[in-house]
């Protein structure tokens, strides 16, 4: 995750750490002073773009929680990167699970479906994200998809 000591992702990282998971923080140098103590490993990057690339490189499954423009940017960047990598690596496809709490991402999901149905998608599965309504469904989905990764 982004590796800083604030926000929803800090809470998720803390819970994962407390449950015995290894927590890897990928932190841009500009935010290194905010590195979360819960991280078992810290990877410093030059900037946000390098951070996204590194997170995509090392991730097995991607979870999109309710968030702002940065979350949407990371979601679409991850989707795009996976689609590009699939051209050269058949194993590049990895799950993106979107927690669509209270319809937070209804508009984005609809836009991706519309793009998928348009001639601009050129046969690519733009709408491949798996939408779930809540954390319970997220956990069920992660259990299911993690057996395939």
Language model: regions and residue ranges:
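Structural loop-to-beta junction motif characteristic of Rossmann-like glycosyltransferase folds
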Residues: 63, 94-95
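Interfacial segments of multi-pass membrane proteins
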Residues: 83-84
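Short glycine/serine/threonine-rich phosphate/pyrophosphate-binding segments
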Residues: 7-11, 70-79
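A donor-sugar binding/catalytic signature common to diverse glycosyltransferases
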Residues: 56-76, 87
């Amino acid at each position: 995750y982004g590796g800083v000591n604030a926000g929803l992702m800090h809470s998720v990282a803390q819970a994962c750490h407390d449950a015995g998971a290894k927590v890897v923080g990928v932190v841009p140098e500009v935010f290194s002073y905010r590195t979360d103590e819960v991280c078992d490993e810290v990877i410093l990057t030059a900037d946000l773009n390098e951070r996204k690339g590194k997170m995509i490189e090392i991730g097995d499954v991607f979870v999109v929680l309710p968030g702002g423009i940065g979350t949407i940017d990371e979601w679409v960047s991850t989707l795009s990167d996976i689609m590009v990598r699939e051209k050269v690596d058949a194993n590049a496809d990895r799950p993106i699970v979107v927690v669509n709490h209270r319809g937070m991402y209804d508009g984005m999901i609809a836009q991706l479906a519309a793009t998928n149905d348009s001639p601009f998608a050129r046969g690519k599965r733009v709408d491949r994200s798996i939408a779930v309504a809540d954390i319970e469904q997220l956990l069920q989905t992660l259990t299911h998809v993690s057996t395939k990764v």
